[in-house]
Amino acid sequence: MQVTFLGTSSGVPTRGRNVSSVALRLPQRSELWLFDCGEGTQHQFLRCDLRLSQLRRVFITHMHGDHVFGLPGLLASLGLGSTSNGVDLYGPDPLDAYLQGVLRTSSTRIGYPLAIHRVREAAEQNTVVFEDDDLIVTAAPLNHRVPAYAYRAEQKPRAGRFDIDKARELQIPPGPVYAALKRGESVTLDDGRTIDGRTLCGPEQPGVSVVYCTDTVFCEAAVQLAQGADLLIHESTFSHAEADMAFKRQHSTSTMAAQTAAEAGVKQLALTHLSPRYAPGNAVTADDLVAEASAIFPNTILARDFLNVDVNPSK
């Protein structure tokens, strides 16, 4: 997996940061997933090497404008500029009414299949939001002024390295059967032998996981969702000194994000959703927030627009 940050500011865009959006690249399936879609997200696509035509799923955390105002325009542009096979949207209950209202009142036609899925029940009952043979997405409710949800996208474990020399020793004919054996499946050959693919593969390879958590004040549900994740993307709207403001507005400080990362045992923390008050030249800057978080969770990085982060299996 590779994560590309398209917007890392909270509330409003700044000269250096757009509002919230994160792209998850899935090169093995030529797909792109989007987490939140603040105003101007489609413009961010034009400034990097992401291909809008690969967009397959969009996960919305909550219905505040800095997380959803870019969605109608992006979906409309996708219909005009590509041959999309369809997009699935996941989010809070009002997402459907919001999107259908905008499309209807603007007489916008989406010329491809568009499905909208409510995540509230799955998040509250700790069930699956999306699953296929390779990936699984779960969600958890957050503590914010409106219903909000964090998401976890995780690759399923994969069969280990296929031992082709051993397969040849067993006189297994090459061809399509090798693909099934590489997946660890059992195959019956033409000569009647049944071969268990797991005996021809090395140790199972763990998948990688990314958790996207915004907007929220510190909450245990986020800690549980992020357990052992390879990358936790967590909002850091305020500095530690602004903790009272964070509780009042139901946002996180840098130290709350770090506490979540530490308690969840994640591998890496990326701070995003930064208040414009921490712009360069101000008394407190984004670098200060990273320093605060790093004192609790050392492997902390600062997200910035167009930053790419490769997410690889832990060794």
Swiss-Prot record:
Pfam families given in the database record: Lactamase_B_2
Alphabetized InterPro entries for the sequence: Metallo-B-lactamas, RibonucZ/Hydroxyglut_hydro, RNase_Z/BN
Annotated Zn(2+) 2 binding sites: 66-67, 215, 273
EC number: 3.1.26.11
Catalysed conversion reaction: Endonucleolytic cleavage of RNA, removing extra 3' nucleotides from tRNA precursor, generating 3' termini of tRNAs. A 3'-hydroxy group is left at the tRNA terminus and a 5'-phosphoryl group is left at the trailer molecule
Cofactor binding comment, as recorded: Binds 2 Zn(2+) ions.
Known partners and oligomeric status: Homodimer.
Protein's name in the database: Ribonuclease Z
Species of the source: Synechococcus sp. (strain CC9311)
